[in-house]
Amino acid sequence: MKAFMDKEFMLQSATAQHLYHDYAEDMPICDYHCHIPPREIYENRRFDNIAQVWLGGRNPDGSYFGDHYKWRVMRSNGVPEEYITGDKPDRERFQKFAEALPMAIGNPMYHWTNLELHRFFGYEGVLNGDTAEEVWNLCNDKLQHDPKLTVRGLIEQSNVAFIGTTDDPIDDLEWHKKIKEDPTIKFTVAPSFRPDKALNIQKPGFVEYMGKLAEVVGKEKLACIDCVCDALTKRIEFFVEMGRRATDHGLDYVPYREATKEEVNAIYQKAMAGEAVTVEETEKYQTYILIHLGKQYHRLNVAMQIHYNCLRGVNRKMNSLLGPDTGFDMINTATCGGEIASLLSALNDTDECPKTIIYSLNPGDDAQIGTILGCFQNSEVPGKIQHGSAWWFNDHKIGMEEQMTRLASLGLLGNFVGMLTDSRSFLSYTRLDYFRRILCNIIGQWVEDGEYPNDEKALEKIVKGICFDNAKRYFAL
């Protein structure tokens, strides 16, 4: 029987162990998509206790922050909500999580949690209800006193070279500016442009949001669709000045419905007058804006990320109580491969298709995405159109294996830009180690089985590329 989580964890062959330890383990990290707050990086926050890091709490505006992966584990174990997002003492909240964790056998949360304890706190045991007090005391002492366990310390010891946060177009990027001007911060932190609220013409709050966007660009209002496009372009350019390498779109599904500028302008005027827009009108507006944005991304050499097929807030009661991003989302089954291809084709018609990374929350879309990639590659950069890494409900062992083997079967795994954390936690960089172990195990097994030659030079290039070098090239770091 193998020991739990030893140095060869998840590495099931001698070749896998060699690839991981000699090529993958010490590569820098490019976390090109995450949700960590830049303010905490600049202020070099020190957490009071492990529950603050893992379970979060409330923001000053009353919204909730924290790891909804962990919240779902706790809810699934019957833990009352008052211990999850409520006001129970942190020690009691931590106890409930510790008691739930052993039930998460086979869940990546079990591995991630114990990897974090091993890596950052030197804890060689496992977390459960019986060890909770011991772990609580150890972690809190280190969090409060160890200079390596401030926010910057965690980032530096994890060998993170680049962090791409997720930011709204109306954000003033104050904390990014301060980070950029601070010579003591050696890693790069850049904003990512996420204009979802400007695209969601069908949702409540659109009119108010467009008023805020107008204010940010120095206008009294955005009177027409050209004004909207101009405002978004100005904000894109501002983000680029602040170091932006990528954008991100979180879409229910990818639309494609062509319309003239006059049609789209009429739809926009209708929405701004407070009238409801139809599904068809929404798709026409979104398509028009996506094409405009895609052209700007290409002009400015930034990558476009598209995340789709998430059905959000399906528990209406809890969503109304706690708000978005609190653990009540699910995989959707929207079919929009043709629309994705049409969007890329429209941009390609004028040679203005940007570098694009496509993620679906539904793993059933993997083969479709894999075949879309090959239709729009060109010589701008190897792997210009990417199949995004296993995302959210798929970033577990099986999900990562399936995403990478599907990509390998239909495209070039060797040009893959690799994994990201998509996290709100500064301890989550162990997820990149988890990914690297799975990657090396897959490739190692192919070599062991005689399905790929034991070509040291080629294997080194592939492994190092997927771990960091490809992302460095792709995002022009």
Where are these regions (language model features)?
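Metal-cofactor-binding active-site regions of metalloenzymes
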Residues: K2-L300, E352-P354, I358-G370, G374-L477
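Short secondary-structure transition/capping segments
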Residues: E43-N44, K317-N319
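C-terminal amphipathic alpha-helical interaction region
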Residues: M304-I306
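Hard-cation-handling environments
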Residues: C310, N315
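Short glycine/proline- and charge-enriched loop/turn segments
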Residues: N319-G327
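Divalent-cation-assisted or electrostatically stabilized phosphate/pyrophosphate-binding catalytic cores
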Residues: T333-I340
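Short, basic/hydrophobic alpha-helical segments
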Residues: L343-D349
